[in-house]
Regions:
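Short loop/turn segments that flank or connect secondary-structure elements
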Residues: 1-171
Length: 171
């Protein structure tokens, strides 16, 4: 069972209800708000297991402040144990799924949080939805960000983030 931060809840946030594909259970494509969202989940008691089992990282980590709620930050943050490159000793990473505007990668909150994880050699990924129903596209950030983060050069960090976003947008 996932441990959740006491007193923290989704509230008006519906980021996961629109970002993720939920097939075949709800026939809901990625990037579209679930048809059952009505100022809250209209099928909460009978929602599919995939919805029942999902908790974004903001609900799990008290270190992420209230401004990290996905609808406020522009990111759905998730832990991951898949696709971690072999050269990482830490086998659990973080995926920052860009949910809002691309400019969210320029926020101090994002840069500081990602930089802190990169400094600890946590595998950090950036993910975006592809056009149409093309699914998600993900890129590892940690390796390319290590030098800029360790040198504390914000302009280089921002340049790497923009290059990574451009790369996955072009895929």
């Amino acid at each position: 069972m996932v441990a959740l931060v006491p007193g923290r809840g989704c509230g008006e946030c519906n980021a996961c209800c629109s970002y993720f594909e939920i097939l075949p259970e709800l026939n809901k494509p990625s990037g579209k708000l679930c048809q059952h969202w009505k100022a809250g989940c209209g099928i909460y008691e009978s929602r599919p297991g995939v919805c029942r089992d999902f908790f974004c990282y903001w609900l799990q980590d008290a270190a992420l402040g209230d401004d990290w709620r996905p609808d406020k930050s522009g990111f759905i943050v998730q832990e991951t144990v898949t696709d971690i490159p072999a050269h990482f000793s830490i086998r659990k990473g973080l995926v920052f799924r860009l949910y809002g505007e691309d400019s969210a990668i320029d926020s101090e909150r994002f840069i500081e949080t990602v930089s802190a994880q990169v400094e600890k050699r946590v595998p950090v990924f950036l993910s975006v939805l592809g056009p149409g129903n093309a699914g998600t596209r993900t890129i590892l950030l940690t390796d390319d960000l290590t030098g800029p983060v360790l040198s504390r050069r914000r302009e280089r960090i921002v340049a790497v983030l923009h290059a990574a976003l451009a790369t996955i947008r072009a895929q």
